[in-house]
Protein backbone atom coordinates (compact mmCIF):
# COMPACT_ATOMS: atom_id res chain seq x y z
CA UNK A 1 0.00 0.00 0.00
CA UNK A 2 1.43 3.36 -1.05
CA UNK A 3 2.02 5.98 1.62
CA UNK A 4 0.13 9.24 1.89
CA UNK A 5 2.06 12.11 0.32
CA UNK A 6 1.86 15.45 2.13
CA UNK A 7 3.00 18.82 0.87
CA UNK A 8 3.90 21.35 3.57
CA UNK A 9 3.69 24.73 1.89
CA UNK A 10 6.11 27.45 2.91
CA UNK A 11 7.11 30.94 1.85
CA UNK A 12 9.05 33.90 3.25
CA UNK A 13 8.15 34.15 6.93
CA UNK A 14 6.93 30.59 7.45
CA UNK A 15 8.60 29.28 10.61
CA UNK A 16 6.82 26.07 11.60
CA UNK A 17 7.28 23.96 8.49
CA UNK A 18 9.79 21.54 10.04
CA UNK A 19 7.58 20.87 13.08
CA UNK A 20 4.65 20.18 10.76
CA UNK A 21 6.79 17.89 8.60
CA UNK A 22 7.91 15.98 11.69
CA UNK A 23 4.33 15.48 12.89
CA UNK A 24 3.14 14.10 9.54
CA UNK A 25 6.16 11.82 9.25
CA UNK A 26 5.47 10.40 12.71
CA UNK A 27 1.98 9.56 11.43
CA UNK A 28 3.45 7.63 8.51
CA UNK A 29 3.25 10.14 5.67
CA UNK A 30 5.87 10.95 3.06
CA UNK A 31 6.38 14.70 3.42
CA UNK A 32 7.90 17.39 1.24
CA UNK A 33 8.38 20.99 2.36
CA UNK A 34 7.80 23.04 -0.79
CA UNK A 35 8.22 26.78 -1.35
CA UNK A 36 5.23 28.47 -3.00
CA UNK A 37 7.43 29.59 -5.91
CA UNK A 38 8.02 25.97 -6.93
CA UNK A 39 4.27 25.54 -7.40
CA UNK A 40 3.95 28.86 -9.20
CA UNK A 41 6.82 27.88 -11.54
CA UNK A 42 5.34 24.40 -12.09
CA UNK A 43 8.42 22.68 -10.67
CA UNK A 44 6.00 20.92 -8.32
CA UNK A 45 2.36 20.06 -8.96
CA UNK A 46 -0.27 20.07 -6.23
CA UNK A 47 -2.08 17.08 -7.74
CA UNK A 48 0.91 14.85 -6.91
CA UNK A 49 -0.02 15.02 -3.21
CA UNK A 50 -2.85 13.74 -1.04
CA UNK A 51 -2.66 16.36 1.74
CA UNK A 52 -1.91 20.07 1.67
CA UNK A 53 -0.69 21.48 4.98
CA UNK A 54 -0.07 25.20 5.53
CA UNK A 55 1.78 25.73 8.82
CA UNK A 56 2.21 28.70 11.11
CA UNK A 57 4.53 31.65 11.05
CA UNK A 58 4.31 35.15 9.65
CA UNK A 59 4.04 34.68 5.89
CA UNK A 60 5.48 37.70 4.06
CA UNK A 61 5.81 39.38 7.44
CA UNK A 62 2.00 39.47 7.70
CA UNK A 63 2.10 42.66 5.63
CA UNK A 64 -1.37 44.06 4.84
CA UNK A 65 -2.91 41.51 7.22
CA UNK A 66 -2.01 38.09 8.59
CA UNK A 67 -1.71 35.63 5.72
CA UNK A 68 -3.27 37.95 3.14
CA UNK A 69 -0.48 37.96 0.55
CA UNK A 70 -0.07 34.18 0.44
CA UNK A 71 -3.87 33.87 0.41
CA UNK A 72 -3.98 36.04 -2.72
CA UNK A 73 -1.29 33.94 -4.37
CA UNK A 74 -3.26 30.76 -3.71
CA UNK A 75 -6.56 32.22 -4.89
CA UNK A 76 -5.36 34.16 -7.93
CA UNK A 77 -2.44 32.05 -9.19
CA UNK A 78 -3.21 28.53 -7.96
CA UNK A 79 -7.00 28.69 -7.84
CA UNK A 80 -7.56 26.07 -10.53
CA UNK A 81 -5.09 23.68 -8.91
CA UNK A 82 -6.84 24.11 -5.57
CA UNK A 83 -10.24 23.44 -7.16
CA UNK A 84 -9.00 20.20 -8.67
CA UNK A 85 -7.34 19.20 -5.42
CA UNK A 86 -10.62 19.73 -3.56
CA UNK A 87 -12.81 18.03 -6.15
CA UNK A 88 -10.52 15.00 -6.11
CA UNK A 89 -11.48 14.54 -2.45
CA UNK A 90 -8.05 15.35 -1.08
CA UNK A 91 -7.36 16.85 2.35
CA UNK A 92 -5.99 20.16 3.57
CA UNK A 93 -5.21 21.76 6.89
CA UNK A 94 -4.22 25.28 7.86
CA UNK A 95 -2.69 25.82 11.29
CA UNK A 96 -2.37 29.26 12.90
CA UNK A 97 -1.10 31.43 10.01
CA UNK A 98 -2.23 28.63 7.71
CA UNK A 99 -5.81 29.04 8.95
CA UNK A 100 -5.60 32.77 8.30
CA UNK A 101 -4.37 32.02 4.78
CA UNK A 102 -7.10 29.50 3.90
CA UNK A 103 -9.80 31.75 5.36
CA UNK A 104 -8.63 34.83 3.48
CA UNK A 105 -8.24 32.85 0.26
CA UNK A 106 -11.90 31.86 0.57
CA UNK A 107 -11.03 28.16 0.68
CA UNK A 108 -12.35 27.70 4.23
CA UNK A 109 -15.02 27.35 5.37
CA UNK A 110 -17.20 27.60 2.28
CA UNK A 111 -15.34 26.26 -0.71
CA UNK A 112 -15.08 22.62 0.28
CA UNK A 113 -18.78 22.16 0.95
CA UNK A 114 -20.01 24.07 -2.08
CA UNK A 115 -21.29 21.28 -4.29
CA UNK A 116 -21.41 21.79 -8.06
CA UNK A 117 -24.22 20.35 -10.14
CA UNK A 118 -23.16 16.76 -10.62
CA UNK A 119 -20.00 14.90 -9.79
CA UNK A 120 -16.96 16.71 -11.09
CA UNK A 121 -19.01 19.49 -12.66
CA UNK A 122 -16.76 22.10 -11.11
CA UNK A 123 -14.09 21.11 -13.58
CA UNK A 124 -16.27 21.01 -16.68
CA UNK A 125 -15.04 23.43 -19.31
CA UNK A 126 -16.59 25.05 -22.32
CA UNK A 127 -14.16 24.23 -25.09
CA UNK A 128 -13.43 26.37 -28.11
CA UNK A 129 -13.01 24.83 -31.53
CA UNK A 130 -9.29 24.54 -30.79
CA UNK A 131 -9.93 22.73 -27.52
CA UNK A 132 -8.85 25.60 -25.31
CA UNK A 133 -10.71 26.11 -22.01
CA UNK A 134 -12.85 29.23 -22.01
CA UNK A 135 -14.81 29.17 -18.75
CA UNK A 136 -15.69 27.21 -15.66
CA UNK A 137 -19.07 26.66 -14.07
CA UNK A 138 -17.95 27.62 -10.56
CA UNK A 139 -17.18 31.17 -9.42
CA UNK A 140 -13.76 31.89 -7.87
CA UNK A 141 -13.27 31.26 -4.17
CA UNK A 142 -15.17 33.82 -2.13
CA UNK A 143 -14.06 34.86 1.36
CA UNK A 144 -16.73 34.30 4.02
CA UNK A 145 -14.76 34.59 7.26
CA UNK A 146 -11.62 36.24 8.53
CA UNK A 147 -9.29 36.21 11.49
CA UNK A 148 -8.47 39.64 12.81
CA UNK A 149 -6.88 41.47 15.75
CA UNK A 150 -7.51 39.84 19.13
CA UNK A 151 -9.84 41.69 21.49
CA UNK A 152 -6.93 41.92 23.91
CA UNK A 153 -5.07 44.01 21.28
CA UNK A 154 -1.94 41.98 21.94
CA UNK A 155 -0.11 38.87 20.84
CA UNK A 156 -1.62 35.95 22.78
CA UNK A 157 0.90 33.31 23.77
CA UNK A 158 -0.54 30.75 26.21
CA UNK A 159 -2.33 27.43 26.57
CA UNK A 160 -6.09 26.93 26.25
CA UNK A 161 -8.60 24.10 26.51
CA UNK A 162 -10.73 23.32 23.49
CA UNK A 163 -14.10 21.59 23.55
CA UNK A 164 -14.76 19.40 20.48
CA UNK A 165 -17.98 19.05 18.52
CA UNK A 166 -18.35 15.24 18.27
CA UNK A 167 -20.87 15.46 15.40
CA UNK A 168 -18.57 17.47 13.15
CA UNK A 169 -18.21 16.03 9.62
CA UNK A 170 -14.48 16.82 9.62
CA UNK A 171 -12.25 13.81 8.94
CA UNK A 172 -9.39 15.47 10.81
CA UNK A 173 -11.16 15.33 14.18
CA UNK A 174 -12.85 11.92 14.08
CA UNK A 175 -12.60 10.19 17.43
CA UNK A 176 -11.88 13.34 19.44
CA UNK A 177 -14.62 13.48 22.07
CA UNK A 178 -12.88 15.02 25.08
CA UNK A 179 -11.42 18.52 25.58
CA UNK A 180 -7.85 18.98 24.40
CA UNK A 181 -5.13 21.35 25.63
CA UNK A 182 -3.13 23.33 23.05
CA UNK A 183 -1.06 26.52 22.81
CA UNK A 184 -2.16 29.68 21.01
CA UNK A 185 0.41 32.10 19.64
CA UNK A 186 -0.91 34.90 17.44
CA UNK A 187 -1.98 38.52 17.33
CA UNK A 188 -4.78 38.10 14.79
CA UNK A 189 -6.84 35.11 15.84
CA UNK A 190 -10.30 36.59 16.38
CA UNK A 191 -12.74 34.66 14.20
CA UNK A 192 -15.26 36.87 12.38
CA UNK A 193 -17.86 35.62 9.85
CA UNK A 194 -19.04 37.82 7.01
CA UNK A 195 -22.53 38.00 8.48
CA UNK A 196 -24.87 36.19 10.85
CA UNK A 197 -26.13 33.93 8.06
CA UNK A 198 -22.63 32.49 7.61
CA UNK A 199 -22.28 31.95 11.35
CA UNK A 200 -25.66 30.21 11.59
CA UNK A 201 -24.78 27.96 8.66
CA UNK A 202 -21.53 26.96 10.34
CA UNK A 203 -23.41 26.12 13.54
CA UNK A 204 -26.14 24.19 11.73
CA UNK A 205 -23.61 22.10 9.80
CA UNK A 206 -21.46 21.42 12.89
CA UNK A 207 -18.58 23.21 11.20
CA UNK A 208 -17.27 24.85 14.36
CA UNK A 209 -15.33 21.81 15.45
CA UNK A 210 -13.58 23.30 18.50
CA UNK A 211 -14.60 26.08 20.89
CA UNK A 212 -12.65 27.63 23.73
CA UNK A 213 -13.95 26.42 27.06
CA UNK A 214 -13.51 27.60 30.66
CA UNK A 215 -14.96 24.46 32.22
CA UNK A 216 -11.46 23.13 32.84
CA UNK A 217 -8.94 25.35 34.63
CA UNK A 218 -10.87 28.59 34.01
CA UNK A 219 -8.03 30.79 35.25
CA UNK A 220 -5.79 29.42 32.51
CA UNK A 221 -8.31 29.81 29.71
CA UNK A 222 -9.91 33.13 30.57
CA UNK A 223 -7.72 36.11 31.37
CA UNK A 224 -8.74 39.73 31.90
CA UNK A 225 -8.75 40.17 28.14
CA UNK A 226 -11.48 37.53 27.77
CA UNK A 227 -11.18 34.81 25.13
CA UNK A 228 -7.92 35.10 23.25
CA UNK A 229 -9.81 35.63 20.01
CA UNK A 230 -12.98 37.40 21.14
CA UNK A 231 -16.52 36.24 21.68
CA UNK A 232 -17.85 35.19 18.25
CA UNK A 233 -19.09 31.73 19.23
CA UNK A 234 -15.69 31.16 20.85
CA UNK A 235 -14.73 29.54 17.56
CA UNK A 236 -11.22 28.22 17.23
CA UNK A 237 -11.44 25.73 14.35
CA UNK A 238 -13.63 25.73 11.27
CA UNK A 239 -13.69 22.66 9.02
CA UNK A 240 -15.37 21.20 6.03
CA UNK A 241 -15.38 17.44 5.61
CA UNK A 242 -11.98 17.55 3.85
CA UNK A 243 -10.33 20.61 5.33
CA UNK A 244 -9.61 22.08 8.74
CA UNK A 245 -8.47 25.48 9.94
CA UNK A 246 -6.98 25.61 13.44
CA UNK A 247 -6.06 28.81 15.27
CA UNK A 248 -4.10 27.01 18.06
CA UNK A 249 -0.66 25.73 17.13
CA UNK A 250 -1.13 21.96 17.06
CA UNK A 251 2.43 21.35 15.83
CA UNK A 252 3.81 22.84 19.07
CA UNK A 253 2.43 20.00 21.18
CA UNK A 254 3.42 16.91 19.22
CA UNK A 255 5.25 14.74 21.71
CA UNK A 256 5.34 11.21 20.32
CA UNK A 257 8.89 10.19 19.53
CA UNK A 258 10.46 13.37 20.86
CA UNK A 259 13.64 12.62 22.79
CA UNK A 260 14.18 14.92 25.75
CA UNK A 261 17.64 16.46 26.04
Describe these PLM feature segments.
Residues 1-109, 115-131, 135-137, 141-142, ...:
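N-terminal beta1-alpha1 cap of cysteine-dependent amidohydrolase-like domains
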Residues 109-110, 199:
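Residues in and immediately flanking transmembrane alpha helices
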Residues 159, 164-261:
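C-terminal and late-domain segments of enzyme folds
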Amino acid sequence: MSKVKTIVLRTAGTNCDQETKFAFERCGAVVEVVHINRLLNKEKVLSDYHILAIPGGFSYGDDIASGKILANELRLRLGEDLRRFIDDGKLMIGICNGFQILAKAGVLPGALNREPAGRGAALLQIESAKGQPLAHDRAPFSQEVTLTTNDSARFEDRWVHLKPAPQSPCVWTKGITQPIFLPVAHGEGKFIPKDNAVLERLKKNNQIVFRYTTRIYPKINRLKSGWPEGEVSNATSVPDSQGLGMAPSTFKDFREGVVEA
